[in-house]
Amino acid sequence: MKFTTNITLRALCFTFIMFFSSCAYFNTFFNAKEYFDEAEKIRLEKEGERIPVSAIDKYGKSIKKSKKVISDFPESKYVNSAIILMAKSQFHRQEYDLAINNIKSILNSVENKQKEEAIYWIALCKWKKGNLQTAINELEDLIS
């Protein structure tokens, strides 16, 4: 009886640990997304003006959480989404080269919808850097 209880307790502990560890990467990605959404809300309230420091700070926190998903949970299904989210945050922080490099690192491994979003953000970064024709060409390729 004691042996069976011990095995049951171990199985329960193992299940508990597995459940919460699998939730960790989702929770970290969720936090990154929350910071991004908060930053977007602040930015859009001041549209047409400089991006407020509070939004820049939230984008920075989103980048930090996204990096945590990427480094701590490299096999997670959220890695590509975290990279795109990080690049979008970098775009709004005017870190265009970082955003482009991060997106390019996953361009061949993402599915169609994410690939279109990735190309769109690369084009926006190139446009902001002053590479207008390159940005236009990328967007034209995207819609053709």
Regions found by a protein language model. Give the residues of each.
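Acidic, polar-rich low-complexity tracts and alpha-helical solenoid repeat scaffolds
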Residues: K2-F3, I17-S144
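Bacterial N-terminal signal peptides that target proteins for export
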Residues: M1-C13
